Amino acid sequence: MDARWWAVVVLAAFPSLGAGGETPEAPPESWTQLWFFRFVVNAAGYASFMVPGYLLVQYFRRKNYLETGRGLCFPLVKACVFGNEPKASDEVPLAPRTEAAETTPMWQALKLLFCATGLQVSYLTWGVLQERVMTRSYGATATSPGERFTDSQFLVLMNRVLALIVAGLSCVLCKQPRHGAPMYRYSFASLSNVLSSWCQYEALKFVSFPTQVLAKVSKVIPVMLMGKLVSRRSYEHWEYLTATLISIGVSMFLLSSGPEPRSSPATTLSGLILLAGYIAFDSFTSNWQDALFAYKMSSVQMMFGVNFFSCLFTVGSLLEQGALLEGTRFMGRHSEFAAHALLLSICSACGQLFIFYTIGQFGAAVFTIIMTLRQAFAILLSCLLYGHTVTVVGGLGVAVVFAALLLRVYARGRLKQRGKKAVPVESPVQKV
């Protein structure tokens, strides 16, 4: 579906998304509303769970509880601290993906269309709603400007709760491999994932959605850096080349774009810092999840484990700040926001399932192409709905970025054909 038609469909379903050509306003100047203060408060809330938990894990390990423990708590402690089986690196690897013998080209084409449509609809809708929730007011009338939703952490919780429910149902309804990873190891990926999502939502208060999309694309560079630091990976020359092209394209876009309405150098700098935080945290999440897959878990099990701790962290932090009740009250005051937040969470959770299914059926290369096109459509859709302007030089920069991404897909395919070990794509879990 052409992005212009998709814009018409979205506006027909949610007329308020483009209402009035409203421009984003600068965030409040109160020091308690500064993003850095909120970040520190949130991080302190997460630390109030992480630090005691880490100390407990170290205590049980030093006491050799696996050999000496007993009683009702032993199975729980064993699952959380020690796990239930050795890492999969010592076992025979899983068989590669195979297609059913009766699969026909027409059936494969229909499945590919289903996957592509599901991914595009889920994440294009998610992107539109994300920008609507974080940059526009609710309850605006002719005499009242309405009020903004400002608590990004509450929105993260909404997304994670629904994703946890979907992952839990999938684990119950579909056969899963025996889980062996120590549960506490999910907490590190959960923490970085929550922080990356918070930075992502918070950044929309300061920079445009197209800028955010290009920043996500450019995270290839820190992912490579984290890969060297965390996983000790080596990279091919073409990967450094495409990473450089992505950097050039993003720079062309950022330097050629004019300032957003009511923006200032200070707010733009805040947005760029938040995007840098998103990229760094998300890069760590991807590499940590890759290491966790050594325990031979399924993607749905990974999704459940990460979201379980994400819900624990965000609920605890919101309760400590007294913000959970305020977020619930905001939903009660504005039913439109409640609908947007619910649909945003549904799109995020369903998108995860489409990711797993697409990679399982067609592989990572096809999935990467679909998601690359989705990012391009997301920029176009945001410009159509919310009036973001892109200059000719900026458009060329966008083209350079996506050409570099497609070049990466092509190079990986050639390496695979030659029998070389291609660098694995970024972990698909928790893409949003």
Curated annotation (Swiss-Prot):
UniProt xrefs under Pfam families: UAA
Q: In Gene Ontology terms, what is one molecular function of this protein?
A: antiporter activity
Keywords in UniProt for this one?
Antiport, Golgi apparatus, Membrane, Phosphoprotein, Transmembrane, Transmembrane helix, Transport
> According to its UniProt record, which reaction does this protein catalyse?
3'-phosphoadenylyl sulfate(in) + adenosine 3',5'-bisphosphate(out) = 3'-phosphoadenylyl sulfate(out) + adenosine 3',5'-bisphosphate(in)
- TM segment ranges: 5-25, 40-60, 109-129, 154-174, 238-258, 265-285, 299-319, 353-373, 387-407
Give the modified residues of type Phosphoserine.
427
Q: What does this protein do?
A: Probably functions as a 3'-phosphoadenylyl sulfate:adenosine 3',5'-bisphosphate antiporter at the Golgi membranes. Mediates the transport from the cytosol into the lumen of the Golgi of 3'-phosphoadenylyl sulfate/adenosine 3'-phospho 5'-phosphosulfate (PAPS), a universal sulfuryl donor for sulfation events that take place in that compartment.
Record protein name field: Adenosine 3'-phospho 5'-phosphosulfate transporter 1
